[in-house]
Swiss-Prot record:
Disruption-associated phenotype: Embryonic lethal (manifesting between 11.5 dpc and 13.5 dpc). Multiple developmental defects (exencephaly, situs viscerum inversus, delay in turning, hemorrhage and defects in limb development). In the node, primary cilia are absent or malformed in homozygous mutant and heterozygous embryos, respectively. The Shh signaling pathway is impaired in both neural tube patterning (expansion of motoneurons and rostro-caudal level-dependent contraction or expansion of the dorso-lateral interneurons) and limb patterning (ectrosyndactyly). The proteolytic processing of Gli3 is altered.
WD repeat spans: 10-50, 51-91, 93-129, 131-169, 174-217, 219-258, 260-300, 453-492
Pfam families in the cross-refs: Beta-prop_IFT122_1st, Beta-prop_IFT122_2nd, TPR_IFT122, Zn_ribbon_IFT122, Zn_ribbon_IFT122_C
Lineage top rank: taxon: Eukaryota
Protein's UniProt name: Intraflagellar transport protein 122 homolog
Gene3D superfamilies: 1.25.40.470, YVTN repeat-like/Quinoprotein amine dehydrogenase
Disulphide bonds in the chain: none
Keywords: Cell projection, Cilium, Cilium biogenesis/degradation, Cytoplasm, Cytoskeleton, Developmental protein, Repeat, WD repeat
UniProt function note: As a component of the IFT complex A (IFT-A), a complex required for retrograde ciliary transport and entry into cilia of G protein-coupled receptors (GPCRs), it is required in ciliogenesis and ciliary protein trafficking. Involved in cilia formation during neuronal patterning. Acts as a negative regulator of Shh signaling. Required to recruit TULP3 to primary cilia.
Coarse class of the protein's main subcellular location: other
Keyword Repeat: yes
Length: 1182
């Protein structure tokens, strides 16, 4: 139960009493010395009524709605009409305390401090009766025969309608417990009149008309000021000094709070025949609430448990319609039912019940366990040995002793949970979340299994009987059905609020919505019928439907889905549907359709249902013939048609199956001689060719194709024989003809090959093409039938067909989303333009989808493709420009992948130094236009954070300043603003440990280099590691003019000895890498190294002076110190000299990217390939 505030108003004086007009449209309030009339629909003050001279204490409306009365401290009573006009006024000797109209005679009882009076419209005077104490409250019984008076001395006086006392009830406590409010239960279903009494001894009690107390006093723990029943008497409202209105059952069990106020509640009433409650307070507040009583229930198969009267639980057997009531005498908060278990959550405990016996119809429950703990949960589920509590995003699994065994934390709010069965203690749960995620949880497993994730929130779930399909109703009222194994959305239907699978049929489900019940079988259209309520279960032909608070079992005929299956010739499925419940006529229709579809097993079962022995005998005979080896289905169907009286259809099938004699016998037996003569043969096949041809024409005209074919062959008319055989699909006859023909007869052989292709016999077609030597047609055949291996083999033997094979193959690969293979196939076919176009599209898609590693790889492949195309002199310059451009983009995207992962994903495993190096590399590389997909914001944000973390405060401040000029996403806006402020507190310089060193001139370069990734002193370009992006200790050098690459390698390989110390470099070369490593006794490069002299340059020059070496320098170099990028022509090889002896560098022989050896080995172990060009370690060539 929850209370929703509809409207609220504030009067200037205390609200002592109020009354509803019986039709509920108006509300009369006693506020100060006036009456206030409100419209209950929106809280509009209609009119204030003046007439009293002092505070109005009470007001009451007559049951017929014609009059209402008010009593005041000015000792007067005013009678008002429903038109808000005062018509009568009379007085007492003291202030008026309460008034009440007789519900039958409309007699008015008015009570003061010393007496009470009875007035009716028929009498002119008011009969008054003295009272021994101050009367505080009064109430008439339902039949209007008795009036109960509550007094300040703790006595309740029950009088007849003439004022004579009949019963006197003395409350314990006497005058210390004044009676402050009383009310008779208005229910007509109660056997006795029941009076509810609230006194200032802070007790709530109940009495019969005889004065006998019902049950014990109920403690309230506050001074009650008002008590009021609901219209049907099922609930009680009590308000008072606790500044709130409490809801009780008619037995006095507290259920909850309607509304908390800021002052004492002096009066509260229920709007007639509704769940609206109005509250009047000491401070003049009027609050109008709507009470919403939610349905608390649980369902498992044919057992349905629901809450009744808020404190009882009723278990209903939906098949037998038996019901059993379990009285809890406390507020029932949650109910869960599963097999023989029933769990009921009360405010301070959970009760677990079990059935007495294993009988499926047993309805006797007994308490199995009690968990005496208070739990707060949204959903409750019971299993064989556990209780599952759902709290927002968390699930807790408790044993029946209350011990928490397991807990699951979800990503989003849990919207739906259902037990889907399983062994005791290992049951499975189906859980639907608000974020659209659907999980399966086993109570003995800590890890949830994600079944699928959809975009919309889950409202309802159900799993099919075999657990292969999942039906989901989302917040858009759409029913979606998924294949659990493939996650594929099978179909979806609109206007659904609940869904249930048939427990006896895998492919049937029903869902409700929009006032209709929808039944869907497989993927067929929905069958609808009108039905109000929510579908909660589907068992066989019964659908369990919940409407408001009532659960009912609806019998639904299964004819419609059965005929849907029959239309698709799905006979076995149609039989399964029929077993759920159809008529005899439906069974016969199913049997006939199955028999015509040659589904004899289904037909036999269906005919058995309708006990048709004649057709059962036919089915038995056909099955016996099939056991003997007969396989001609047309012949079987012809027999079926003849049994059904469809003689002409039977004759056609006999003819089609080659058993014209059976048709002849059939027509003869039926004395249908006119039809029988159509099956008579004529002519002698041994006559002349002309006669045979005419006979063949006649046979063809009378639909005797086989005979016609044989005759045409005998007559040498092969073309006509092939035409007839091909049109009838006789492949065996066609291949016989083709094999008998000479290879010189090209036209008929080509006709045979054409028919073979049409009849899906590519092997025979290939044999025919080979026979006539038509290799081009054979290649086309292989391509059309996707027999690529044969096509490739033929292309290798005959290169002139290579283009005819690889181009269609590449197009087929592209159509099947195998783009990388398609690109290679285009390349192999010499279609460079298509190959490049495929790569460009792949690259663009990778960038758009933020797959930057793939983008880098595709750009590298593009560059190598362009380098290959640059061998054409006409395209050399353009292709080399593209090569360098794509190489540059590949390096950018390769580095940016790490930045993207760091900024977009919740966790990053990259070192701060790596992130710092990459972002600095990108910053210096993005001096011009920024490529698509690369975010300067992310790059600068990463650089700023890592610079600050590593002590490069000056660079961090520069990055934050740059960010101020860019459009920042909202998710990192606060982080950047905070970083911009905090960086100001740091010193304005960078850590010396981070400053990059030029290995040529030993100059310390600033972190922010206006020249980009080159030395500011000597302009020597930096060589970066492709993994950590640290500056490598390499210097590129160039060969003196006249020295070829082969001569240079030969000079380097001479390895002239060094006299100072032994050279200790060790080189490891393989197909996968070229590695320099240092032996333990390695000495640094001496000052007498000729290469060192070549590193010098002219100071102060702004031009880059490359290092150029001659033969003597090359001869002095050790092969172990040199790395060579052996680019294919027209590019020149690139040479690099290692200047530090204490670090090992590895270069990939395919993409020529440099790595620290340890990094490269780790990355190759992780990916089994080069991280840059994806060259696998088991590849033998570069």
């Amino acid at each position: 139960m929850r209370a929703v505030l509809t409207w609220r108003d504030k009067a200037e004086q205390c609200i002592y009493d109020l009354a509803f007009k019986p039709d509920g449209t108006q509300l009369i309030l006693a506020a100060g010395n006036r009456l206030l009339v409100y419209d209950t629909s929106d809280g509009t003050l209609l009119q204030p009524l003046k007439g009293h001279k002092d505070t109005v204490y009470c007001v009451a409306y007559a049951k017929d709605g014609k009059r209402f009365a008010s009593g005041s401290a000015d000792k007067s009573i005013i009678i008002w009409t429903s038109k808000l006009e005062g018509i009568l006024k009379y007085t007492h000797n003291d202030s008026i305390q309460c008034v009440s109209y007789n519900p039958v005679t409309h007699q008015l009882a008015s009570c003061s401090s010393s007496d009470f009076g009875l007035w009716s419209p028929e009498q002119k005077s008011v009969s008054k009766h003295k009272s021994s104490s101050k009367i505080t409250c009064c109430s008439w019984t339902n039949d209007g025969q008795y009036l109960a008076l509550g007094m300040a001395n703790g006595i309740i006086s029950i009088r007849n309608k003439n004022g004579e006392e009949k019963v006197k009830i003395e409350r314990p406590g006497g005058s210390l417990s004044p009676i402050w409010s009383i009310c008779w239960n208005p229910s007509r279903e109660e056997h006795n009149d029941i009076l509810a009494v609230a006194d200032w001894g802070q007790k709530l009690s109940f009495y019969q008309l005889s004065g006998k107390q019902i049950g014990k006093d109920r403690p309230l723990n506050f001074d009650p000021c008002c008590i009021s029943y609901f219209t049907k008497g099922e609930y009680i409202l009590v308000g008072g000094s606790d500044k709130q209105v409490s809801l009780f059952t008619k037995d006095g069990v507290r259920l909850g709070t309607v509304g908390e106020q800021n002052s004492w509640v002096w009066t509260c009433r229920v709007k007639p025949d509704s769940n609206y409650v109005v509250v009047g307070c000491q401070d003049g507040t009027i609050s109008f609430y709507q009470l919403i009583f939610s349905t608390v229930h649980g369902l498992y198969k044919d057992r349905y448990a629901y809450r009744d009267s808020m404190t009882d639980v009723i278990v209903q057997h939906l098949i037998t319609e038996q019901k059993v009531r379990i009285k809890c005498r406390e507020l029932v908060k949650k109910i869960a039912i599963y097999k023989n278990r029933l769990a009921i959550q009360l405010p301070e405990k959970i009760l677990i019940y079990e059935l007495y016996s294993e009988d499926s119809t047993d309805m006797h429950y007994r308490v199995k366990e009690k968990i005496v703990k208070k739990f707060e949960c949204n959903l409750l589920v019971v299993c064989a040995d556990h209780i599952i509590l759902c709290q927002e995003k968390r699930l807790q699994c408790l044993s029946f002793s209350g011990v928490k065994e397991r807990e699951w934390q979800m990503e989003s709010l849990i919207r739906y949970i259902k037990v889907i069965g399983g062994p005791a203690g290992r049951e499975g749960l189906l859980v639907g979340l608000k974020n659209g995620q659907i999980l399966k949880i086993f109570v003995d497993n800590l890890f949830a299994i994600v079944l699928l994730k959809q975009a919309t929130a889950v409202r309802c779930l159900d799993m099919s009987a075999s657990r292969n399909k999942l039906a989901v109703v989302d917040e858009n009222d759409t029913c979606l059905v998924y294949d659990i194994h493939t996650k594929e959305l099978l179909f979806q239907e609109p206007n659904a609020n609940s869904v249930a699978w048939n427990t006896q049929c895998e492919d049937m489900l029903c869902f409700s919505g929009g006032g209709y019940l929808n039944i869907k079988a497989s993927t067929f259209p929905v069958h609808q019928q009108k039905l109000q309520g929510f579908v909660v279960g589907y068992n066989g032909s019964k659908i369990f439907c919940l409407h408001v608070f009532s659960m009912s079992a609806v019998e639904v005929p299964q004819s419609a889905p059965m005929y849907q299956y029959l239309d698709r010739k799905m006979f076995k499925e149609a039989y399964q549907i029929a077993c759920l419940g159809v008529t005899d006529a439906d069974w016969r229709e199913l049997a006939m359709e199955a028999l015509e579809g040659l589904e004899f097993e289904t037909a036999r079962k269906a005919f058995t249902r309708v006990q048709d022995l004649r057709y059962l005998e036919l089915i038995s005979s056909i099955e016996e013939r099939k056991k003997r080896g007969e396989t001609n289905n047309d012949l079987f169907l012809a027999d079926v048609f003849s049994y059904q009286g469809k003689f002409h259809e039977a004759a056609k099938l006999y003819k089609r199956s080659g058993h014209e004699n059976l048709a002849l016998d059939m027509y003869t037996d039926l004395c249908m001689f006119e039809y029988a003569k159509d099956f008579l043969g004529s002519g002698d096949p041994k006559e002349t060719k002309m006669l045979i041809t005419k006979q063949a024409d006649w046979a063809r005209n009378i639909n005797e194709p086989k005979a016609a074919v044989e005759m045409y062959i005998s007559a040498g008319e092969h073309a006509k024989a092939i035409e007839i055989s091909g049109s009838h699909g006789w492949v065996d006859m066609l291949i016989d003809i083709a094999r008998k023909l000479d290879k010189a007869e090209r036209e008929p052989l080509l006709m045979c090959a054409c028919y073979f292709k049409k009849l899906d016999s590519p092997g025979y077609a290939a044999e025919t093409y080979l026979k006539i030597g038509d290799l081009k047609s054979l290649v086309q055949l292989y391509v059309d039938t996707k027999r690529w291996d044969e096509a490739f083999a033929l292309g290798e033997k005959h290169p002139e067909f290579k283009d005819d094979v690889y181009v269609p193959y590449a197009q087929w690969l592209a159509e099947n989303d195998r783009f990388e293979e398609a690109q290679k196939a285009f390349h192999k076919a010499g279609r460079q333009g298509e190959a490049v176009r495929v790569l460009e599209q792949l690259t663009h898609n990778a960038v758009v989808e933020s797959r930057f590693n793939d983008a880098a790889y595709y750009y590298w492949m593009l560059s190598m493709q362009c380098l290959d195309m640059a061998q054409d002199p006409a395209q050399k310059d353009a292709m080399l420009d593209k090569f360098h451009h794509f190489q540059h983009l590949a390096e950018l995207y390769h580095g940016y992948q790490t930045i993207h992962r760091y900024t977009e994903e919740p966790f990053s495993f990259d070192l701060p130094e790596t992130l710092f190096n990459i972002s600095k590399f990108l910053l210096h590389s993005l001096t011009k236009a920024t490529p698509l997909g690369i975010s300067k914001v992310n790059t600068l944000f990463t650089l700023a954070k890592q610079s600050k973390a590593l002590g490069a405060y000056k660079l961090a401040r520069h990055a934050y300043d740059k960010l101020r000029g860019l459009q920042i996403p909202a998710r990192i806006q606060k982080s950047i603003e905070l970083g911009t402020l905090t960086i100001r507190s740091k010193p304005f310089h960078d850590s010396e440990e981070l400053v990059p060193l030029c290995y040529r001139c030993s100059t310390n370069n600033p972190l922010l280099n206006n020249l980009g990734n080159v030395c500011i002193n000597c302009r020597q370009p930096f060589i970066f590691s492709a993994s950590s992006y640290e500056v490598l200790h390499l210097v590129e050098f160039y060969l003196e003019e006249g020295i070829t690459d082969e001569e240079a390698v030969a000079l380097i390989d001479l390895e002239a000895p060094r006299h100072k110390r032994e050279g200790k470099w060790r080189e490891t070369s393989s197909n996968n890498s070229q590695t320099l490593k240092l032996d333990e006794t390695m000495d640094s490069i001496g000052e007498d190294d000729p290469f060192t002299a070549k590193l010098s340059f002219e100071q102060g020059s702004s031009e880059f002076v490359p290092v150029v070496v001659n033969r003597s320098v090359l001869r002095s170099m050790s092969r172990r110190d040199v790395l060579i990028k052996r680019w294919p022509p027209p590019l020149q090889w690139q040479y690099f000299r290692s200047l530090l002896p204490d670090a090992s560098i590895t270069m990939c022989p395919s993409c020529f990217q440099m790595f620290h050896s340890e990094d490269y080995e780790l990355l190759v172990l992780q990916h089994a390939c080069c991280p840059y060009c994806r060259r696998r370690i088991d590849d033998t060539g570069p």
